[in-house]
Amino acid sequence: MVNKDNNYTNMQKTSYHNGTGNHPEHNDNEDYWNILLSDLKDSDNWSNKIALDFASGKGRNVSNMLSICNWNRVDGVDISEGNIEFCKTWYNAKLSDWYCNNGVDVSDLKDNEYDFIMSTIALQHIPVYDIRKSLITDLLRTLKPGGLFSFQMGFGEGLESPLGPRSAYYTNFYDANGTNSHHDVRVHNESDVIDDLKNIGFVNITTEVRESYSDSGHTHWIYVKAYKPQ
């Protein structure tokens, strides 16, 4: 278990308290639609099912998912109180529930609730392996058996960046003095992610490395898909 009262999470909560941007420019990323959300193209397969966006920001991904499938519900969870209050007001007519999490797990979410979980431009901002593992382990709990987790992280060589230092995948850098690209984690090889997800309990894990999009902090991104066992 990760202590909720740790330096990194406290810094994140302060940084994100009032909210973030909605990043509409990332809707123009073809890989967003053709890789991250590619499984949703078979829209009939998701009718009356339930999805979640982890680190949902101001609701862009939730709105996008609602627009392409006839879901029962698409929820959002985020560390920012400002973002969640914005979404509760702005999307009050949508088929969505919104949750503000504590930064180290998603304990307010039900077991075996979601058929599909996505996350983008989020996990790469957390240079603390123990926190990412705690979050991903808890997201697995909330997936239904056979459910899919599709996410993206920064990928490339070295730890240098024009935006600030990067940390390696298994590093625990609790004392980062900034988030949201100021001190990201960088995946150096696909096997780190695959092995980690297997150890957490996921199966049928696939990855795809592509050039990054509107992200000067990473030359490439890695897209990952992993399933909860049936």
Per-segment meaning from a language model:
Residues S119-A122:
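A short beta-strand submotif of the Rossmann-like class I SAM-dependent methyltransferase core
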Residues D108-I117:
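A short acidic, Gly/Pro-enriched loop at the edge of an enzyme's catalytic core
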Residues L143-F149:
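Short glycine-dipeptide loop
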Residues M65, D138-L139:
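Class I S-adenosylmethionine-dependent transferase superfamily signal
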Residues F54:
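Conserved beta-strand/loop positions that form the S-adenosyl-L-methionine
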Residues M1-W46, G57-V106, Y129-D130, F149-Q230:
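Class I (Rossmann-like) S-adenosyl-L-methionine-dependent methyltransferase catalytic domain
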Residues I126-D138:
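A short, conserved alpha-helix within the catalytic core of class I
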